[in-house]
Each structure stands twice: as structure tokens, then as C-alpha cells.
Amino acid sequence: MKSKNASVFMVQETNARKNGKHQLDNFVLFESKRTKMGGGSMLGVSKDLNPVLVSLYENDCELIVVETKIGRREIRFITGYGPQEDWSDDLKAPFFVALNTEISKALSEGKSIYIAMDAKCKLGTTYIPKDMHNMSKNGEILSNIIETNALIVVNGLEQKCSSVVTRQRHTEYGRVEESAIDVVLVSADLEDYLVSLNICSN
């Protein structure tokens, strides 16, 4: 964080079963601990920004919503760990319902939105022109949320996004599987403030 001079960061798959395990000087850390296998999310904000926890989900889904003020702009930062593609609709629903609710609520209150998450979604070339996969079932659900709330998919802004692949896996048969399932979404009012999105699949 110091080398990047970051004020806000988001981490998924912390695998934390209890809060308070991690500490970072001059940051307030918000965690959604994982009650089942895998997962766990964290959102850290510089103490100088006086962050306030808006919502925390950690039972049926993982989602953290924190608000802070930068200049005159009130921004809601959202991170989380999306449901697996092969889960039933009943298991997927809590995450997407919570995500849409938090986005809609923030917009109705005049807040800007910045979302970075392990979405477990393939959005396809509709949103990410060089995506190597077609839109998946989870992608269809997220697509509805994007359209309903007029969000910008930063991964798809080719002039600002450094790469497409966010996940790379080497199989036992020597193949390399690549995907773009980690996404950054912002409210339309933040698009012009974005300088770049640097992606490292390693």
C-alpha cells in the first residue's frame, strides 16, 4: 500500500474466519469473514478519509459497502465475493439482490459508486471487447444490474484498462485457462475521473 500510495484497497479470498487478524497502519479495515469454505473479503480505507461502514453481508453472501468523502464527492466503495457459476439460483440470489439493492440505494442518495470484486462472472464482448469467453449465466445477472443502474464496466474501457485477463490457471494437462471474472464497475459520474486500470493476472 505504501509503494502505491493507495488510499483505498479491496481484497477478496482472505480466507479469514474471524475479524481483526489483519492490521495496517493508518488504515481502517472492514472485513466480511467467511463462514463457509473459501472466500472472505476486506476493504481498507485511509483513516484520513474518515470512512463509514454502510452495510456488511457475511451470512448468505459476502459484500462490504463503505462510504467516504473525497473532495466534495461522496463515494460508496463496494467489494465482495460472487457466487460460483454452478451454484443453484437460490444460493446465488442473495449476493446479486444485495448488490443491486446497495447500488440502487447509493444512487438514489446521490452517491458515486466504485465497485471492485471477484464477481465470478463472465461478461463477454458486450462489455469487455477482448473477452475470450461468452457471457455466462452469472454474467447475465450482473448485466441486468449494470444496465438498470447505468454502470460503467472499467475492464471494457480499452484506452484505460491495461489488460483483459484477470485470472490465469495452469491445468494438470499443461493447458492455461484464462478468464476475466474480476471486475471494476463505477457510476457514470466517475468515468472521466478514471486514469487507468492496471490488471495483473499473476
Report the location of each language-model feature:
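A shared catalytic/ligand-binding motif for oxyanion handling
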Residues: 1-202
